[in-house]
């Protein structure tokens, strides 16, 4: 051991300095001077493990406070709060910006989040909605290169085409060959027994991950399920009077996250049920806009999703509802 190192070791390891000063000195070297923990250990005559523990003690005691000067700083804090509050596996909060359009930004964020969890050859189940279709558009290259397979969670071909239509022809895509909603519960039951419908729905219940949109009653005429013609404005008003705040896959939820009881539409839908969806390991909800806050909150407290991609203003509104 060099004479310099012996001198340093006697000085610091012998605790000639108060621990607070030692923490401060280690922090300065690490954050200000950009030294590695090994470099600091060499300089102060301390093992790397001791340096690591001093840095952690500094963070816990408040001696070290890291400030991130970025528009993403608030988003990162909100992600952490959402994960802790609702026990989420994934939380992604995007900055509140005017451009590009929100659904485009949400789609990009959801695509990036899914790229981090999907393994080659796995099966991704997809719900309808503008944000989820934007997600597929931005996942197209990844889906092709990693041979990720796709399956729809609900009937209805039209609402899926803006996303699926962007994929390479070689991509494996299974679509439920039936409408999202049919004229009666009896017709729905007959179609569910058809092997072509049943097999795709069974595949969807075995997916490795799912991405779904969250609709809101407060969207009024902007709601995808209304614009697609699956419900009428009169039905939308009736659902609201019965306590509905939003929907996932056409199933309408109350503020507490439970399905609204007694709605005929729930028996007329063709697709994976909410209970079946809940069995999947990862269910990422993609939604933004303050008018969707209550619907997102319902999905979270009802454990309908365990991942969320949203934007900053919406995240704050959701957390306000939870407080």
Swiss-Prot record:
Q: Name where it's found.
A: Cytoplasm
| Modes of activity regulation | Inactivated by phosphorylated autoinducer-2 (phospho-AI-2). Phospho-AI-2 acts by binding to LsrR, which is then unable to bind to the promoter regions, allowing the transcription of the target genes.
- Highest taxon of the lineage: Bacteria
Where is the chain membrane-spanning? none
Give a yes or no for keyword Iron in this entry.
Answer: no
Which positions make up the DNA-binding region? 37-60
**What GO CC terms are in its UniProt record?**
cytoplasm
Q: Which InterPro entries match?
A: NagB/RpiA_transferase-like (IPR037171), SorC_transcr_regulators (IPR051054), Sugar-bd_dom_put (IPR007324), WH-like_DNA-bd_sf (IPR036388)
Q: Which UniProt keywords apply?
A: Cytoplasm, DNA-binding, Repressor, Transcription, Transcription regulation
Name the Gene Ontology molecular function terms of this record.
carbohydrate binding; DNA binding
Function, as annotated: Transcriptional regulator that represses the expression of the lsr operon in the absence of the quorum-sensing signaling molecule autoinducer 2 (AI-2). It also represses the expression of the lsrRK operon. Acts by binding to the intergenic region between the lsr operon and lsrR. In the presence of phosphorylated autoinducer-2 (phospho-AI-2), LsrR is inactivated, leading to the transcription of the genes.
Name-wise, this protein is: Transcriptional regulator LsrR
């Amino acid at each position: 051991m060099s004479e310099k190192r012996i001198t340093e070791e006697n000085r610091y390891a012998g605790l000639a300095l108060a621990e607070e000063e030692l923490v401060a000195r280690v922090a300065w070297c690490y954050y200000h001077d950009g030294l590695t923990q090994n470099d600091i250990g060499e300089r102060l005559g301390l093992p790397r493990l001791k340096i690591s523990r001093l840095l952690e003690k500094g963070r816990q005691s408040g001696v070290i406070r890291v400030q991130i000067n970025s528009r993403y700083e608030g988003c990162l804090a909100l992600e952490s709060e959402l994960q802790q509050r609702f026990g989420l596996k994934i939380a992604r909060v995007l900055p509140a910006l005017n451009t590009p359009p929100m659904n485009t930004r949400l789609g990009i964020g959801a695509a990036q989040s899914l790229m981090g969890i999907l393994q080659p050859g796995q099966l991704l189940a997809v719900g309808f909605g503008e944000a989820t279709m934007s997600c597929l558009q931005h996942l197209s290259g990844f889906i092709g290169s990693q041979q990720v397979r796709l399956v729809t969670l609900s009937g209805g071909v039209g609402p899926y085409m803006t996303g699926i239509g962007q994929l390479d022809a070689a991509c494996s895509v299974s679509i439920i060959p039936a409408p999202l909603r049919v004229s009666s519960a009896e017709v729905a039951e007959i179609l569910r027994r058809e092997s072509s419908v049943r097999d795709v729905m069974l595949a969807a219940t075995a997916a490795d991950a799912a991405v779904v949109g969250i609709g809101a009653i407060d969207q009024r005429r902007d709601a995808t399920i209304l614009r697609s013609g699956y419900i009428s404005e009169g039905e939308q008003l009736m659902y609201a009077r019965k306590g509905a705040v939003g929907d996932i896959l056409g199933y309408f939820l109350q503020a507490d996250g439970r399905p609204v009881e007694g709605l005929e539409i729930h028996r007329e839908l063709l697709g994976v049920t909410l209970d079946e969806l809940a069995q999947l390991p990862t269910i990422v909800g993609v939604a933004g806009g303050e008018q969707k806050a209550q619907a997102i909150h319902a999905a979270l407290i009802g454990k309908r999703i365990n991942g969320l991609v949203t934007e900053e203003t919406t995240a704050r509104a959701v957390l306000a509802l939870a407080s």
